[in-house]
């Protein structure tokens, strides 16, 4: 849900009219840390988890066709992503992880709307431009953890120039 930063008593009062729903997902160190006791604590383990979750959502969509009364909250949101009803925002720092998430989106038929943080977005600026993916980037904050080391102060300019075709 997209919210307006306004004084209100309830979240529905803050909702931006007619804005699409969105889902923010993380890649990299955060899911490795959070899910380490439930899955392999590696980037490959993360990708396996992403793919398994999307396969589960595809199966859920098939079940809904035969039994519309069947509800599975765990898969409902990702089914909305696969149907294009929910926009995807991805929290990624590294270029290889952004490229991997783009590949997963292509595999399952959805598009990533925005990459957040993206300290290595400059490395794949042309790919982001070609795919029409927005990048919400920090101007001057990096190096606070290992996956956020390899940035340049020109990150935003490089990504913007690729988008404009002037890079």
Stretch-by-stretch model annotation:
Residues 95-99, 118-125:
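Active-site environment of divalent metal-dependent phosphoester hydrolases
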Residues 1-37, 111-113, 120-167:
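Active-site-adjacent C-terminal substructures of enzyme catalytic domains
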